[in-house]
Every structure is written in structure tokens, then in C-alpha cells.
């Protein structure tokens, strides 16, 4: 059965979404949808999104419901035959277990993306869509909760180069890092 799910994990600012977009292009003519927890989060009213992102105020949203909705949407898309590149931050063992409960039956290729703190700091400041405190929180807690098939450090490697390596692994059937 051909693989139809790639899951990219890592802290905020490591380049998960950038890698997902590069993979979409590299995997053409196959059409892969990029989906994430943020796909649901950014459906919220702008004032709530800005409060969460700029003030680091997560108390105003039901994060568990947003994650569950993202998993449910991804599951539906996969069941309908779509190919998905799903990216998310996993901060705990519980989060990793939730991901695998929701999407594990689809035999995902698990990709872990890391990056140096200095690079994440620069990227976060350049983006301006979240606080450094949130980025640092993710940097400290993300990673190590899943055993990835492939792991990459995006500090000095472009998303296009990482995507090319992943595509080569997908085409060769190689799963191990």
C-alpha cells in the first residue's frame, strides 16, 4: 500500500510548514494536502488568534478540542483517499499517544525536525506571529516523544534540500533515519 501520510513534528520555528510546502512541490505530480493543527486554529476569530499568539494566552481556547478536530479532519481526508502532510508540535508523551491513536492506523512516515535555539529565535522574531516565550517553551519540551523514521536539523539545511532527501526515501521505501 503506498504511503499517504507524512507527519512532521518539531518545535515552533523549526520549519515544519516550510518543509511541508517544499514537500508538496517536490512530490508533484502527486497532490499532497498540507494540514495541521493550525489549519483549525486559524479558523477562530482573528481577535482570539491574535490574543493567543501575541499574548501567549492559551486559556481562551480549548486546545484539546482544536487538536481533536485537526485529527478528525485529517482522518476524514485520508479516508477519502487524499495524501496528507500533517505538521504539529508534540509537547508531551500524551500528545504523542494522541497522534498515534488518531492517525497511527494510516502508517505515517514520522519526520522530526529540529533547529538550534539561536535560529529559532531569529525565525520567531522575523515572523512576529508568536512570542519568544512560546517558542522557547516548545523548544524545551518538543522532541523525544515519538521515534521518528527520519530526523533532520534545519539550522543550516534548506527545506528544499530536506524535501529532496525525504522524497528519495519515499521512492526507495527507506524509512529509517
PLM feature spans:
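Glycine-rich phosphate-binding loop used to anchor ATP phosphates in small-molecule kinases
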Residues: 61-107
Amino acid at each position: 500500500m503506498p504511503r499517504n501520510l507524512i507527519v512532521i513534528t518539531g518545535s515552533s520555528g523549526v520549519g515544519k510548514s516550510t518543509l511541508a510546502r517544499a514537500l508538496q512541490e517536490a512530490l508533484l505530480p502527486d497532490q499532497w494536502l498540507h494540514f495541521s493543527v493550525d489549519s483549525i486554529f486559524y479558523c477562530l476569530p482573528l481577535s482570539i488568534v491574535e490574543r493567543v499568539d501575541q499574548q501567549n494566552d492559551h486559556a481562551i481556547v480549548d486546545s484539546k478540542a482544536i487538536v481533536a478536530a485537526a485529527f478528525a479532519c485529517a482522518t476524514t481526508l485520508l479516508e477519502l483517499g487524499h495524501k496528507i502532510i500533517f505538521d504539529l508540535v508534540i509537547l508531551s508523551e500524551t500528545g504523542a499517544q494522541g497522534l498515534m491513536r488518531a492517525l497511527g492506523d494510516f502508517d505515517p512516515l514520522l519526520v522530526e525536525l529540529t533547529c538550534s535555539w539561536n535560529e529559532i529565535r531569529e525565525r520567531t522574531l522575523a515572523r512576529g506571529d508568536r512570542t519568544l516565550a512560546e517558542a522557547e517553551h516548545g523548544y524545551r519540551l518538543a522532541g523525544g516523544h515519538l521515534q521518528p523514521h527520519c530526523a533532520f536539523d534545519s539550522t543550516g539545511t534548506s527545506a528544499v534540500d530536506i524535501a529532496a532527501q525525504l522524497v528519495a526515501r519515499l521512492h526507495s521505501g527507506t524509512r529509517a533515519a
